[in-house]
């Protein structure tokens, strides 16, 4: 199958499983639960990832004043590409074993403002796409990457992220299809801002990308 046919097939495939996206404002009365932010991490020679992580942790500690815990799951030097999905799944399993009811998957180069903070402290009765507040880079509705808050029940029901996506790209699309199959809608915050710490765009670095992400997403749908 040539690349253009594959891309067209992928578009049809995504339309078949339409995401249910709902605008969402912070409720007036919020009930808090034990919450943890799970950060998948892997340093590389192309970007200042360690420096970003060193800024990320104290920023969140100051912003949330101990109301949310942080778990960093680091991939070893295994001579393979970054596997964000597998790292997040590991983090979620560890978090569940420790009694956390709310798990937020979060890229470590994204920093929320004080308004966005309120969505982090809101129980996700349905997944809350916190990354929707990251407007400087992604503005299309189907984007569900960057940061996602989910409750334990929805994580188990959707089976989390795929474990076999190596390199940047695709695991969020696969999660979206899994959620769609289980009729789980995604809430989109309408206020607040998330800003990205500047670094070289991963999409431009071939060595870091998942070069078969379209095939990977389609395969995940057919086998999951």
Question: Predicted regions: what is each one?
Answer:
Residues 1-58:
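N-proximal low-complexity "stem/linker" segments adjacent to membrane-targeting elements
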Residues 1-20, 30, 164-167, 173-224:
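C-terminal catalytic/acceptor-binding lobe
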Residues 54, 66-100, 135:
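Active-site-proximal specificity loops/subdomain of glycosyltransferases
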């Amino acid at each position: 199958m040539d690349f253009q046919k594959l891309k067209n097939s992928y578009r049809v495939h995504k339309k078949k499983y339409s995401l249910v996206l709902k605008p969402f404002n912070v409720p007036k009365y919020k009930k808090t639960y034990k919450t943890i932010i799970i950060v998948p991490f892997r340093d590389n020679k192309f970007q200042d990832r360690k420096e970003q992580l060193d800024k990320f942790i104290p920023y969140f500690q100051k912003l949330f004043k101990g109301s949310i815990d942080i778990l960093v799951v680091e991939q070893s030097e295994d001579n393979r590409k970054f596997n964000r999905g597998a790292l997040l799944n590991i983090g979620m399993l560890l978090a569940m074993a420790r009694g956390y009811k709310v798990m937020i998957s979060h890229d470590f180069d994204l920093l929320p403002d004080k308004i966005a903070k309120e969505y982090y402290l809101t129980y996700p009765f349905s997944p809350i796409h916190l990354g929707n507040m990251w407007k400087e880079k992604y503005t299309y509705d189907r984007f569900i990457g960057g940061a996602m808050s989910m409750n334990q029940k929805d994580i188990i029901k959707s089976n989390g992220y795929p474990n076999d996506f190596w390199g940047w790209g695709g695991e969020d699309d696969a999660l979206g299809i899994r959620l769609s199959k289980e009729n789980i809608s995604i809430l989109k915050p309408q206020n607040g801002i998330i800003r990205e710490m500047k670094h070289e765009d991963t999409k431009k670095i071939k060595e870091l990308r998942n070069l078969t992400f379209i095939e990977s997403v389609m395969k995940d749908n057919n086998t999951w």
